[in-house]
Amino acid sequence: VKRSLAANAGVSMIIRGIDEDKLLNDKDAMPSDPPEYLYDNNLFNDVNYIFNKDTWLIPLRYNLQYMRENHASTSFDNYSSWSVKATFSKKRTLSQYERPQKQEEAAYTQEIHDSIQANIDQNIVATVRDNPDVAFYYFLPPSSICQWDEWNQKGVLKIQIEAERMMIESLLAYSNVRIYGFSDRFDMITDLDNYMDKEHFSDEINDKIIDWIHQDAGRLTKDNYIQYINAISQFYTSYDYEEIFNG
C-alpha cells in the first residue's frame, strides 16, 4: 500500500483486507524471501524480472490454454480470478486443513503486547497516519471456523482477539480510515461450503463484503467496537470446535 501511494499521486481511496493471521508476526517478518529488485527504485536490475523465463513461460502456458478453450477476453473484474476453477466445499476445506496438536493457552506477556503494537503501528497505522488526504477502508475478513480452530489449538486464540482489538483501537484514532469487522458473521464462517481452505472464501462472499462496505454495514466505531470484540470473544472461546470434524 505504501509503495502504491508513493508511485501514484492521484490515489484517493484504498480498500484493504487485513490478514488477521499476520497480526501476531514480528513487525519485520516476511512470508518468504522476496526479490528485492522488484521493490527498489533501480531500473537496471529489473532485467532480473524482464528476462526471467518464468515471467514469459508461465503466462504463455495459461494464455495458450485459455485460447484453446475458446474463452473470450477477460474483463478487469475477472482477469486474475481463480475462483472459476476453485472448489468451495466443506470436504475441500477440511482436506486442505492440517489441524495442529492442542497446546496450552499461551501467556499474554508485555513482550507479546509490545510486539503486536509495533507490528500494527509499522504495517497498518503508519500508512494511514502519513496519508491524511487518502480515504482508507480496512476490513477484517470472515475467515473460516478452521482458522479460528487453528488459533484455539495453538493456544493463541485470546491473544489473537486482543490483537484485533488493539488494531481496531489504533485505527479509530484517525478520521481518514473506516474499519469494518466481519468476524461476527458466524453463520457464514461456520459453513465450510463457503470456503476452499481455512482462509479463502468464494467470490460470492467477496461481493457481499463490497456490498456491506458500500452500505456501511459492519463498520466499527468508538461506540461499538468493544461490543464487537466481546461478541467474537464469547463465540470463539466457547465454540465446540470438534463439531467441525463430525459428519
Locate each region found by the language model.
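Conserved catalytic-core segments centered on acid/base and nucleophilic motifs
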Residues: 120-128, 134-137, 199-201, 205-206
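Extracytoplasmic/secreted proteins, especially bacterial periplasmic and envelope-associated proteins
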Residues: 55, 119-123, 162, 166, ...
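Serine-dependent acyl-ester chemistry module
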Residues: 62-119, 143-158
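Short secondary-structure boundary/capping segments
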Residues: 28-35, 152-156, 195-196
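Low-complexity, serine/threonine/proline-enriched polar segments
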Residues: 39-78
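Membrane-embedded segments
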Residues: 1-50
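C-terminal regions of proteins
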Residues: 165-247
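Extended hydrophobic/aromatic segments used for targeting, binding, or gating
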Residues: 128, 133-136, 140, 144-192
